[in-house]
Regions:
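Histidine-anchored nucleotide/phosphate-binding helix
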Residues: 55-59
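STAS-like cytosolic regulatory interaction modules
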Residues: 1-43, 60-164
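Residues immediately C-terminal
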Residues: 46
C-alpha cells in the first residue's frame, strides 16, 4: 500500500443506517494520518443521499486540505447519476477497473459503541445540509427532509435549559 493511501470498500447498499459509522471511520482514518482515499464501490449498487452527503463533505475536506480529490472506484450508473443530479460529482475522481490496493483490503473494526438514533439522525441532517451548501439547487429537494430530521433530533435531544 502506498504511504498515506487507504481504500474503503463499500459493500451492499450505502444508506443512512451506516452513515454515522462511515463518518466516524473516516475521521479515525484521517486522524491516523491517511491522506489519499479511494472508495471501492464495486459491490455497492445503490447509495442514498445521506451516505452521498457524508462522502461529499469528506471529499470536500480532503480536496481543500490536500489539493487532491478522493477517488470513487467502479461507481454504478445509478451512483454516477446521483452524483450528477446532486451536483457533487466534481468533488471526486472516478475510475473504472481494478486496483491492487482494493484487492488488499482487510476489515477494520470501529472503536466505540454503535451509533445511537440521535447520532444517526444528526449525521443525516448534517449530510443533507452539506449537499445544500455544496449545491444550492438541492435546497428544494431536501428542505422537507431537513425539517423532518431537525424535528426528530429535537425530540431525541431536547435543548438543554439555560444555565442560571
Amino acid at each position: 500500500m502506498a504511504q498515506g493511501e487507504v481504500v474503503v470498500k463499500i459493500c451492499g447498499r450505502a444508506t443512512f443506517a451506516c452513515g454515522a459509522d462511515l463518518k466516524r471511520l473516516l475521521g479515525e482514518l484521517r486522524g491516523r494520518g491517511w491522506q489519499r482515499f479511494t472508495f471501492d464501490l464495486t459491490g455497492c449498487p445503490l447509495m442514498d443521499s445521506t451516505f452521498l452527503g457524508i462522502l461529499a463533505g469528506f471529499g470536500m475536506k480532503v480536496s481543500e486540505a490536500k489539493g487532491r480529490k478522493a477517488t470513487l472506484l467502479n461507481p454504478s450508473s445509478k451512483i454516477v447519476d446521483l452524483l450528477d443530479n446532486l451536483g457533487v460529482g466534481h468533488l471526486f475522481e472516478t475510475q473504472q477497473g481494478t486496483t491492487a490496493l482494493a484487492d488488499q483490503c482487510q476489515p477494520v473494526e470501529l472503536s466505540g459503541p454503535p451509533a445511537s438514533k440521535a447520532e444517526t439522525t444528526r449525521t443525516a441532517l448534517e449530510a443533507h445540509e452539506t449537499l445544500m451548501a455544496i449545491e444550492p439547487s438541492n435546497a428544494p429537494k431536501f428542505k422537507d427532509v431537513i425539517r423532518f430530521l431537525a424535528e426528530d433530533l429535537n425530540k431525541l435531544e431536547p435543548p438543554s435549559p439555560p444555565s442560571p
